[in-house]
Amino acid sequence: MADDAGAAGGPGGPGGPGMGNRGGFRGGFGSGIRGRGRGRGRGRGRGRGARGGKAEDKEWMPVTKLGRLVKDMKIKSLEEIYLFSLPIKESEIIDFFLGASLKDEVLKIMPVQKQTRAGQRTRFKAFVAIGDYNGHVGLGVKCSKEVATAIRGAIILAKLSIVPVRRGYWGNKIGKPHTVPCKVTGRCGSVLVRLIPAPRGTGIVSAPVPKKLLMMAGIDDCYTSARGCTATLGNFAKATFDAISKTYSYLTPDLWKETVFTKSPYQEFTDHLVKTHTRVSVQRTQAPAVATT
C-alpha cells in the first residue's frame, strides 16, 4: 500500500504537484484529462523533463532565413525580430533566446467530437499558456487524437505566438514598470476583457485564467473587467491574450520621439544568407551512395 500511495502522490505520479498548481475551479486547470485517466497512463510524461524527448538532443538545422540568422548569431535578441515584424516560423528561435526562462502551463484539456458516417470521432483540444514572467507571453491551442500530441503541438504553437508585453506605471515613474501602460481591451467571441492599470502593490485582480496569463507576462498589478460567456475558457484566454498583445498597439506620447530607421536583417545580411543557403543546398543534394548488387 505504501508503494501505491507513493506512486499516486509522488512528483511524477498523476496526483503529484502538477495538480496543485492548476486549481480546481469549474472548467479550469485541474479539470483536464487527469480526472478521466484515473492513473491508466494518460497523465504520464507531463513533467518538465519528459516533454520533447529525443527531439531536444538533435542539433537544430534551421530551414528559414530568420532561423539561419539567429543560429549564426547575426540577430542578437528577440526584440530585433519584433522591431521589424518578422514572422517566426520555427519554435527553436524562441528556445534559442528564451529557452531557459520559459515556463508553460496547461490551462485546459477538453474533448471535442465530430459526427461522421461511422459515428462520433473524439479528439482532445489542449490550451497551453507559455511565458518567461518578464515581458513575453504566448497562447497555443491544438487539437489531436491523443492528449500528449495535443499538448506538444499546443506548446509549439504557443512559442510561435509569443508576443512582447509593454509594461508601464500607474502614477509616478518610480522603480520598475509594474502594470499595463494604459487601458486595453481584447475580444474573442462574446468575451470582452479589459485591462486597467493599478497602483503598485494591488496585485492582479481577475479570474484565474487571465491572472495566469498576466503573471506569465510579467505584470504585477492590474485590474480586469470581463463581459460575455467567460465560462468558455478558450475564448476567455484568447480575449486576455488579445488584450495583452495590444499593449504595443498604442503610440503614447513617450514614444513620439523620432527614431532612426535601419535596414531589415534580411537586407543587412543578404550576402551571408546567400552563402549559407548555398552550403545547405549542397548538403541536401549530396545524398549518400547506395551500394547495389
Swiss-Prot record:
The keyword Membrane does not apply. GO terms for cellular component: cytoplasm; cytosol; cytosolic ribosome; cytosolic small ribosomal subunit; extracellular exosome; focal adhesion; membrane; nucleoplasm. Residues 102-165 form the S5 DRBM domain. It is found in: Cytoplasm; Nucleus, Nucleolus. Residues 7-34 have a biased composition (Gly residues). InterPro entries: Ribosomal_Su5_D2-typ_SF (IPR020568), Ribosomal_uS5 (IPR000851), Ribosomal_uS5_C (IPR005324), Ribosomal_uS5_euk/arc (IPR005711), Ribosomal_uS5_N (IPR013810), Ribosomal_uS5_N_CS (IPR018192), Ribsml_uS5_D2-typ_fold_subgr (IPR014721). This is Small ribosomal subunit protein uS5. The gene is RPS2.
